[in-house]
């Protein structure tokens, strides 16, 4: 079970966007794509057949999983994630600071 999943609220802990929060759009093997953060400019060639106008666009670039942490809204801080098995035998993720289950 992965500790960071799709639509999790994460906080960036290093880099130019430090202390910024956002939702995870896509999870790759060891990288995550965070909505509206870690933007880079890409030069796009126009393609009239596809209806694409040329110019400079901003795209989101993946971040390493080690540079983000899950955001705990109860404590308003970054938190660590633990994995445990509940009474029904189903694995669940929880915050290590206050033992709340991550929904």
UniProtKB/Swiss-Prot annotation:
GO molecular function terms here?
rRNA binding; structural constituent of ribosome
State what protein this is by name.
Large ribosomal subunit protein uL24
| Cell membrane among keywords | no
Q: What do we know about how this protein assembles, alone or with others?
A: Part of the 50S ribosomal subunit.
Q: What GO CC terms are in its UniProt record?
A: ribonucleoprotein complex; ribosome
> Cross-referenced CDD domains, in alphabetical order?
KOW_RPL26
InterPro entries in the cross-refs:
KOW (IPR005824), Rib_uL2_dom2 (IPR014722), Ribosomal_uL24 (IPR003256), Ribosomal_uL24_KOW (IPR041988), Translation_prot_SH3-like_sf (IPR008991)
Superkingdom of the source species: Bacteria
**SUPFAM superfamilies, per the entry:** Translation proteins SH3-like domain
By sequence similarity, the record places it as follows: Belongs to the universal ribosomal protein uL24 family.
User: A single GO BP annotation from the record?
Assistant: translation
The record, for SMART domains, names:
KOW
Described purpose of this protein according to its UniProt entry: One of two assembly initiator proteins, it binds directly to the 5'-end of the 23S rRNA, where it nucleates assembly of the 50S subunit.
Q: Which UniProt keywords apply?
A: Ribonucleoprotein, Ribosomal protein, RNA-binding, rRNA-binding
